[in-house]
């Protein structure tokens, strides 16, 4: 740090105000700041002005002395005040200036982008009092748009992109300085203490007592914090003596990794300012008010460089407060080459360690200069008297195009015929490919449809016999034609189907991942998600797919596995028969459960919706929201479809979630219904024994767990067990000849998962005894055994990559069925042994029923698919193989792709990209599914909901507001009575309103083309349900505690704070589960829902309603020839002669209008006049442009 010197001083006369009557008036410098983007020094003064200086070398100097030139000056304080500028922050798009009651955001040219005052925010009436007496500001952690502001009473933040919302932090007390680290905010309190604050958890992580008086300066770099300040001088005479402050001779250093102070740096002159060097974080720059500066190494405090600044001595004409020179506002540039500060005569001093440099940042952007118009531009007038040669021509070294010879001919290169292919290559290729002419394999999914010869095909034949079905938008089915190639497969009806996505195996290519395991993406057209052809990916009739454009969608495959386990399905869905609707403020606010639900409840609703959806797709949004708010699931959240995780991290996440799910289901059953969820519970026993009589140590413990962690046996044990299996299988064969053992790979090929299970369920180890080691050293024997197997055995396979490679060598590691034998070992220990059923027969269980007690079969497993190397992030996805039918039908579930798959593909684990993670075996005597249906069926495996009688539907007949019943509330609806109990076929009108939680994600190309990546995320805000006579019986507003991006007031009628539990004027606020349970009960009771645009409503609510229970007026009054659906407002004007939705939307009004339109349709349909009326509606719409006249 040797070589620093003063290179420039700007006198105080530069900062004089533009007042011609008193030109000697001095403006005090209150803040300084180096720019982080361009070569600027920013200066704030006491009159509320911010100005900038830019550096340049003098043109008339031989050595290029640095000069600072004024660039801009503009007023940044509140327009009604001239408050001093307390702090300046550099932003990539401009400059932030802090005054007493305003924050101004200006471009570097001085143009105002934004001015934030107390009137900017629309939170509530108390905001005006909060956003005053501003003291400090900084950017939020890892964000340049969130600005954190500290006042003399609190701390707040706002977004530069949306500055109308002011959020408060949970921090009390006055703030003098603010700064930010990578994850935390550093707060200098007015009482001299230092707080380490976490903005994510909204809490103070650590508080240090830094200085007795106050902190004068604060700086951070890396993991270190440096502070300097003042202490209160002890009172010597009487207690009412005014407080006096003395500067502390130490600079405090704090390490945020260990959250404590380290060795301070002494500075006898009194530290008033401290800064970290930006390039050498171990170097700090300490300055006193008298101008003494030291460069000190905090790890080697003997390494000190001392400098003294030449400060101007104030005179009585400039100040009358202090006649001593005083230094303030020390700042260092981003590249560490310049220092700037000012004295109390308002002179600005610039120091540098590199006199030949003029850059304040490493890579500065060019400074925008004003346009200079050349006033001496001459215009040449050409008329008949002036020759054209006066204009002049440049000198050309080559001939111009206009000077080409007459015999020159131009030949177009593309007009040449291509060179013929060598006949020898064609003959060689035909010989190699058995006569087929194929040079290179063509990947259609990668490169798109090939440019091949198209044979003639008449339009008539194409429509009637050769219709092509490929994955495309539904709106393009009738207009898009596609070439029929060899990759298109014809079905029994003569139609061609592109089945490349359903390809599950490449012949002879084990390392290439087939198409059916690829990561799928939902495409969005201008018609939205409804236009995407989900039916192409799922041609089954009973298995639904799950969408993957939802947070935590990585659990889709695991949820599919549990949904097809009948015992788990019956118990989880059966729990919905009892009502559990917490609505107290402790649940909603304190425990952060605004949905008023649980993992058990949402999983029950989801399972029921997955059954009712049949082959339609389902979202897991409601379950994901509860998961996001669950306190024990914060480490399990993933909202980017595993793009940030490698192979091992994906396995860890899925297995951890599996354990969390089973444990949470058990806890929810005990909390809600005082029941146990023991379908997957394994009971184990731990026995500790000493060494005979010399060590009488003995202990036994018992416990339980809900899943088994699979452990790979040691290599020597695998070797030994393989030999035993060979002997047992071939002792009775006289022609058997033992083969020599050449390698471990050859030995392991006859092992399977049962070997791993026996080793994992019977663990044995020894540890040194610590209680009797005074006599002689000996060991304790610890044996862990599984003593009880559940009816559903869930196995977590969290193995390393080398261990998975061992499994890849097995011919069939998974077994379809096995017997579990409960027996005692030689030592009398209870345990289990397993035997594979090589050739199961119908009477195999009865023949050996005395020996084998439990018979298990494979239900399915969750499999990780590696598309690239294991260490690559974002190249892995999850699928599930599940045995759906009792007759042995296997299906592959890859999000919304559902397809049958052969059994040999399920048990083939030889490809290295295929790794089982969660395996589920179940006992063969599982009960049948108890599905809830709304109609009487002839099968014995379904239950009619209306006849069940055990489901609690009392919520339909009472109010259940959040925070309890509100007395005196004037209801806009009348509750149902038991006499009005909904029956199958009853008409109810419904309408819902929504708010936006997240905006849509767009991909914008350079040419302006926009592609929708993810749609906007909506949340239910209000639901209204009406009787058939138009009288409402449900009108609920849904509580929201998370941030709402847009209330969509013009469409929803929801005003800000309407959904806030503490600030809302609405009395009928309920939790999301309360409203959802009402709709779920109505759905299962078999009512018919009438509404307008019900597809989007039910999709957002996550309710799967059969088509036979929907009467959608948007579909009823739709004529396919026009390809335009009519709005409810226009239909009401034409059909009912009424004007609705004149102001904000009202869900009761909209539901009643849809009900009247449906009744109108019934009357017209019975009179057989509906088609003519529909034509009249569209003709009127064309004349009015489908808009209601004002």
Curated annotation (Swiss-Prot):
Matching HAMAP family: PAN2
Protein's UniProt name: PAN2-PAN3 deadenylation complex catalytic subunit PAN2
Positions bound to a divalent metal cation: 991, 993, 1097, 1150
Single GO cellular component term: P-body
PANTHER family in the cross-refs: DEADENYLATION COMPLEX CATALYTIC SUBUNIT PAN2, PAN2-PAN3 DEADENYLATION COMPLEX CATALYTIC SUBUNIT PAN2
Domains (record comment): Contains a pseudo-UCH domain. This ubiquitin C-terminal hydrolase (UCH)-like or ubiquitin specific protease (USP)-like domain is predicted to be catalytically inactive because it lacks the active site catalytic triad characteristic of thiol proteases, with residues at the equivalent structural positions that are incompatible with catalysis, and it cannot bind ubiquitin. It functions as a structural scaffold for intra- and intermolecular interactions in the complex.
Cofactor note: Binds 2 metal cations per subunit in the catalytic exonuclease domain.
Catalytic activity: Exonucleolytic cleavage of poly(A) to 5'-AMP
Recorded family membership: Belongs to the peptidase C19 family. PAN2 subfamily.
Cofactor(s) recorded in Swiss-Prot or TrEMBL: a divalent metal cation
Domain Exonuclease: 988-1158
EC number(s) from the headed UniProt entry: 3.1.13.4
Sequence ranges of the WD repeats: 24-63, 129-166, 167-207, 222-264, 266-306, 322-361
A Pfam match: PAN2_N
Gene Ontology molecular function: any one: nucleic acid binding
Activity control, per UniProt: Positively regulated by the regulatory subunit PAN3.
Residue numbers spanned by region Linker: 364-511
Function statement: Catalytic subunit of the poly(A)-nuclease (PAN) deadenylation complex, one of two cytoplasmic mRNA deadenylases involved in mRNA turnover. PAN specifically shortens poly(A) tails of RNA and the activity is stimulated by poly(A)-binding protein PAB1. PAN deadenylation is followed by rapid degradation of the shortened mRNA tails by the CCR4-NOT complex. Deadenylated mRNAs are then degraded by two alternative mechanisms, namely exosome-mediated 3'-5' exonucleolytic degradation, or deadenylation-dependent mRNA decaping and subsequent 5'-3' exonucleolytic degradation by XRN1.
Source domain of life: Eukaryota
SMART domains tied to this protein: EXOIII
Organism: Candida albicans (strain SC5314 / ATCC MYA-2876)
Cellular compartments annotated: Cytoplasm
First-listed, main subcellular location of the protein, grouped into a coarse class: cytoplasm
GO biological process assignments: mRNA processing; nuclear-transcribed mRNA poly(A) tail shortening
Enzyme class: hydrolase
């Amino acid at each position: 740090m040797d070589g620093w010197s003063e290179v420039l001083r700007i006198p105080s006369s530069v900062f004089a105000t533009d007042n011609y009557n008193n030109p000697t008036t001095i403006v005090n410098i209150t803040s300084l700041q180096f720019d982080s983007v361009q070569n600027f020094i920013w200066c704030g003064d006491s009159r509320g002005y911010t100005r900038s200086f830019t550096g340049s070398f003098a043109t008339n100097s031989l050595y290029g002395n640095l000069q600072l030139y004024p660039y801009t000056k503009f007023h940044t304080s509140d327009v009604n005040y001239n408050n001093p500028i307390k702090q300046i922050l550099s932003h990539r798009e401009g400059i932030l200036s802090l005054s007493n009651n305003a924050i101004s955001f200006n471009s570097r040219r001085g143009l105002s982008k934004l001015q934030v005052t107390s009137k900017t925010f629309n939170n509530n009436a108390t905001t005006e009092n909060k956003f005053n007496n501003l003291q400090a500001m900084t950017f939020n952690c890892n964000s340049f748009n969130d600005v954190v502001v500290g006042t003399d009473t609190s701390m707040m933040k706002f977004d530069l992109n949306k500055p109308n919302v002011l959020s408060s932090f949970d921090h009390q007390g006055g703030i003098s300085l603010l700064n930010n680290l990578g994850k935390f905010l550093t707060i200098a309190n007015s009482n001299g203490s230092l707080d380490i604050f976490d903005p994510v958890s909204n809490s103070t992580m650590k508080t240090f007592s830094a200085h007795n008086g106050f902190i004068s300066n604060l700086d951070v770099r890396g993991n270190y914090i440096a502070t300097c300040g003042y202490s209160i001088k002890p009172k010597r005479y009487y207690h009412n003596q005014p407080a006096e402050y003395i500067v502390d001779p130490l600079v405090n250093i704090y390490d945020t990794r260990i959250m404590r102070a380290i060795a301070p740096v002494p500075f006898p002159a009194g530290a008033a300012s401290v800064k970290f060097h930006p390039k050498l974080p171990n170097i700090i720059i300490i300055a006193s008010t008298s101008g003494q500066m030291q460069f000190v190494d905090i790890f080697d405090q003997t390494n000190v460089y001392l400098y003294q600044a030449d400060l101007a001595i104030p005179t009585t004409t400039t100040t009358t407060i202090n006649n001593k020179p005083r230094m303030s506002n020390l700042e260092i540039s981003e590249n560490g080459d310049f220092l700037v500060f000012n004295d109390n005569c308002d002179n600005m001093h610039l120091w540098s360690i590199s006199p030949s440099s003029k850059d304040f940042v490493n890579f500065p952007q060019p400074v925008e200069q004003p346009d200079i118009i050349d006033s001496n531009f001459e215009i040449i007038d050409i008329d008949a008297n002036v020759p054209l040669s006066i204009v002049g021509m440049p000198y050309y070294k080559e001939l111009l195009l206009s000077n080409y010879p007459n015999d020159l001919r131009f030949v177009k290169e593309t007009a040449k015929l291509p060179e013929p292919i060598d006949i020898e290559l064609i003959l060689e290729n035909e010989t190699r490919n058995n006569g087929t002419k194929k040079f290179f394999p063509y990947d259609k999914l990668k490169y798109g449809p090939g440019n091949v010869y198209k044979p003639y095909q008449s339009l008539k034949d194409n429509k009637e016999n050769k219709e092509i079905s490929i994955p495309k938008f539904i709106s393009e089915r009738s207009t898009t034609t596609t070439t029929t190639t060899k990759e298109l497969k014809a079905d029994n009806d003569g139609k061609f189907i592109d089945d490349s996505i359903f390809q599950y195996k490449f012949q002879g290519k084990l390392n290439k991942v087939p198409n059916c395991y690829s990561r799928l993406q939902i495409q969005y057209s201008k018609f939205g998600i409804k236009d995407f052809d989900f039916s192409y990916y799922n041609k089954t009739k009973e298995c639904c797919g799950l969408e993957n454009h939802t947070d935590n969608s990585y659990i889709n495959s695991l949820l599919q596995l549990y949904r097809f386990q009948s015992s788990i399905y019956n118990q989880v869905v059966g729990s919905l028969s009892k009502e559990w609707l917490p609505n107290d403020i402790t649940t909603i606010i304190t425990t952060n459960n605004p949905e008023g639900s649980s993992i058990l409840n949402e999983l029950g609703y989801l399972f029921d919706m997955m059954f009712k959806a049949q082959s339609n797709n389902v979202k897991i949004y409601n379950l994901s929201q509860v998961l996001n708010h669950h306190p024990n699931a914060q480490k399990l959240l993933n909202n980017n479809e595993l793009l940030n995780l490698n192979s091992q991290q994906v396995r860890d996440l899925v297995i951890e979630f599996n354990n969390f799910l089973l444990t949470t289901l058990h806890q929810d059953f005990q909390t809600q219904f005082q029941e146990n969820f023991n379908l997957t519970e394994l009971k184990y026993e731990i026995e500790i024994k000493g060494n005979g009589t010399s060590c009488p140590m003995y202990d036994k413990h018992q416990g339980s767990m809900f899943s088994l962690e699979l452990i790979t046996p040691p290599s020597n044990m695998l070797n030994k067990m393989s030999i035993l299996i060979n002997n047992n299988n071939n002792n009775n064969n006289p022609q058997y000849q033992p083969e020599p053992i050449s390698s471990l790979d050859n030995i392991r090929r006859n092992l399977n998962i049962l070997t791993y299970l026996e080793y994992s369920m019977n663990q044995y180890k020894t540890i040194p005894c610590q209680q009797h080691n005074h006599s002689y050293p000996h060991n304790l024997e610890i044996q862990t055994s599984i003593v009880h197997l559940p009816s559903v055995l869930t196995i977590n396979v969290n193995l390393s990559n080398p261990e998975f490679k061992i499994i890849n060598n097995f011919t069939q590691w998974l077994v379809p069925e096995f017997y579990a034998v409960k027996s005692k070992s030689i030592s009398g220990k209870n345990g289990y042994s397993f035997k594979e059923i090589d050739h199961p027969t119908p009477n195999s269980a009865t023949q050996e029923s005395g020996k084998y007690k439990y018979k298990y079969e494979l239900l399915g497993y969750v499999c990780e698919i590696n598309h690239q190397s294991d260490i690559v992030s974002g190249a892995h996805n999850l699928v599930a193989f599940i045995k759906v039918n009792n007759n042995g039908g296997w299906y592959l579930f890859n999000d919304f792709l559902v397809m049958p798959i052969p059994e040999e593909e399920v048990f083939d684990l030889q490809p290295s990209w295929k790794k089982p993670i969660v395996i589920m075996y179940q006992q063969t005597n599982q009960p049948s599914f108890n599905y809830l249906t709304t109609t009487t069926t002839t099968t014995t495996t379904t239950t009619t909901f209306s006849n069940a009688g055990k489901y609690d539907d009392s919520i339909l007949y009472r109010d259940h507001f959040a925070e309890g019943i509100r007395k005196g509330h004037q209801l806009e609806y009348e509750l149902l009575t038991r006499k009005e109990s909904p029956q199958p076929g009853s008409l109810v009108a419904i309408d819902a309103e929504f708010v936006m939680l997240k905006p849509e994600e767009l991909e914008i190309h350079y040419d302006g083309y926009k592609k929708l990546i993810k749609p906007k995320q909506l949340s239910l805000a209000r639901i209204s349900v009406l009787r058939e006579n138009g009288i409402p019986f449900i009108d609920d507003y849904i509580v929201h505690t998370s941030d709402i991006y847009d209330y969509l007031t013009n469409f929803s009628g929801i005003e800000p704070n309407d959904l806030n539990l503490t600030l809302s004027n609405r009395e009928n606020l309920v939790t999301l589960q309360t409203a959802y349970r009402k709709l779920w009960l109505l759905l299962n009771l078999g009512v018919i829902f009438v509404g307008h645009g019900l597809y989007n409503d039910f999709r957002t609510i996550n309710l799967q309603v059969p088509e036979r229970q929907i009467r959608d007026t948007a579909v009823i009054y739709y004529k396919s020839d026009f390809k335009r659906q009519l709005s409810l407002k226009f239909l009401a004007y034409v059909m009912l002669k009424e004007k609705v939705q004149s102001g904000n939307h009202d869900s009761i009004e909209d539901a009643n209008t849809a009900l009247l339109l449906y009744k109108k349709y019934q009357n017209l349909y019975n009179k057989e006049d509906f088609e003519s009326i529909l034509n009249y509606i569209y003709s009127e719409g064309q004349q009015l442009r489908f808009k209601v006249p004002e």
